[in-house]
Amino acid sequence: MEGIELGIQDLDRSYQIDTQAASSGDEEDRQEVPERPTKRKRTKEEKERRRSEKRARKEKRRSETAQAAQIQAPQAQVGIEAEVAEAPADYDEVEQVVEDAPVSEDNKKRKEKKHKKDKNKGKKGGSEEQEEEDREAIAASAVATLAQALVSSESDQVAPPVDQIQTPARPTTATSTSATWRTNPNQYGSTKVKKVPLELSPPPAASSLTPAPPATQLIPVTPLTAASAGASSFAVRDKINSLKHPKSSTNAPKAIRSTRKGEDTKESDAQLRLRFKDPKAQEEWLASTSIGKTELLRLEKEGILSYKKGKFTEDEKVSIKKALENYQKIHRMSSFDLVELVMTKTLQATDKETVREFWKDIAASVPGRPILNVQPFVRRMLDPKAHKGRWTSEEDELLLRAYAQHPREWTKISSIVDRTEVDCRDRYLKELVNRDTRTAGRWTKEEEDKLEEVVDRVAKGLRAEQVHGEERETPEEGTELVEPSDVPWDIVSKEMGNTRSMTQCRIKYRDAIWPRKLGLGKDDHVGRTLKVLTRLKNLNYESEKHISWSQVRETLEKYSLKEIRNSYSNLKKSVTSDPHVASLTYPELIKVMYDKAVMQRGRKVRADQRDYPSKETVESGDEAY
C-alpha cells in the first residue's frame, strides 16, 4: 500500500494532477444531478373521471354539430328532426363506420411508433385523448354530411351524385411522424436512399385542432334531376358502406353472369351477332381469337358467323409470305428464328404472349380465315419436313415400327420418320391401318351398295345424337341428305370391315354415289367442258395457281369437283401437245381452250342434227346453257 501511495504522489508531481480535488469534484457533480421522478399510476377514481369528461365532450360536440346544421338550414329543421327520429340508427351507423374505418399498413406502423415514443415520454394518456378527438371530428363531419343530404331531399333541392360526396379526411396533428429523404453514395458509386425520421414535437392542446368544415363545403351541388328523400338517404348510406368496405364489389356494377350454361351461351351469341353485323369486325375477331374447331362449327351452323374454307388461294399465299417477311424485318430475326417461332406451339412456349401476337399479325393478312386454319397452313409451308413427295415403302415400314414403339405419340414418331406430325398421322390412319385386309382396284356393285347403306346408317346415327332423342314432326325429316364433308369416314371404313380405307370410301362416295343421290344425270363431256371453260373465262384468274375449284363450281352445281377438274385437265392435255400452245400464258391458254371447246360443241350439235333433225339450232357455246 505504501508503494501505491508513493506512486500516486510521483504522478501528482510529474503531471501536476490533484487527484483528491478531482475525486471531490466528481462527487459534487453526482450530487448536483437531480433524481428522475418516477411515473405515478392513475387511480380508479381518476380513470373514471377522465372517462366521464370524454363522454361530456362527445355530447357537447354532438349538440354543437346539431346546432350548426340548424343554423345552415333553418327552414328544414323540422324535417331533419323527423328524419332523425324515424331513423336514429344512421348516427350509430356513422359511429360504427368511424370505428371500423380501414387503416393502411403505413398508418399502423406510424401509430405504433407514436405510441412507443409517447409511452417513453410519459404521454400515453395525451395521445389516447388526441386519437379520441380525431375520431369525434370525423364522426361530426359524417353526421353533418348526412344531415345536409336529408335537408336537400326534404326541401326539393337538387341532390348531389354520390361520387361527388367528399369523404372527411382524418385531421393530422403535429405528433405525426414526418421524414426526409437523403441520398448517400455507396461503395459501388451508386446512391442509396435512406429515410431519416425527424424529431417529434409535443402534441397540441385539444382546443388548437382545426374544426371540421361545414357540410355545405363538402357537397358540391350540380344541376341534376331532383331526387326524393328516400333516394338521398339511400345514396348517403351507400356512400358510408363504400367507406366501410372499400374493397368490396357489392356496390360496383357487375357483368351479368348466368348460373346456367344455356343462358350464358345465348347471351354470348347475342353479343356476337350484334358485333358481326360489321364484316370488318368479324374478320378482326377471327384473326385475333383462338377458338376451337367445335365451337367454330357451332357458330357457323347457328348463322352467327361465316368464314373462308378450302384451299388457300395464290393471293392468300402471297399475303402470308409478305406478312412473314415484314415480321422478320421488324423484329430483326433470322430465317432459322422465324421457322422456330412458327413451329413453336403456344402452350409450350416460354413467352406465350409473343407467340399469340405473332399469329394475330399473320392471320390478319388473310381476312376471313380463322387462326385455327392459318396455323397449320403456315407451319406446313415452312416446316423443313414437309413437301417430301410420295411415301416410299421404306418410310411406311419405318412409320409402322415407330408407331409400335410410341403409339399415338406423333411428335416422337415425326422425329423418327422425318415427316410432319400431320403427314405421319394421316398416312398411318388413312393408308397403313389394316393394310393387309384392304382391297385395291375397282369397286364392285356390291361394295358400292354396301358403302351407300353404311353412310346412310352412320348419318342417321349422327342426326339422332344431334337432336338428343327429340321426336320428329314428320317421318320425312329423317331422310335428309348428308354432305360428304360431314361424314366421319373413319367410322365408315370400320363398318365396311376395313376392306377400304378412309380415303377410298370418301372419294368413291363423293364422285359416284353422292351425285346420283342428288339426281344429277350424266351429261356429254363436250357440253360440260364448254361450261367449265366459259366459267373460267368469266372469272378471269391471273394464273392456274389462282383457280379456286369450289368457286368455279358455284354455278356448276350439277357437276362434281372431280368432273369439273377432269374436264379442264383433259382439254388442256390435248391442246398443250403443241409446243407453241404450251408456252402460252394462262389467259392466252384459256382463250385457246375456249375456242376449241366451242368448235367441238358446234361439231357435236351438227352431228346431232343429222341424226335427229330439229327446228332449233345452237350456234355458239354461250347458248349451250
Curated annotation (Swiss-Prot):
Disulfide cross-links: none
SMART domains from the UniProt entry: SANT
Gene Ontology CC: one annotated term: nucleus
Composition bias type Basic and acidic residues, residue spans: 31-51, 260-269, 605-618
Transmembrane regions listed in the UniProt entry: none
Region (Disordered): 1-139, 151-192, 240-269, 603-625
Cell location: Nucleus
Biased composition (Acidic residues): 89-98
One Pfam family this sequence matches: Myb_DNA-binding
Name of the protein in its database record: DNA-binding protein LIV4
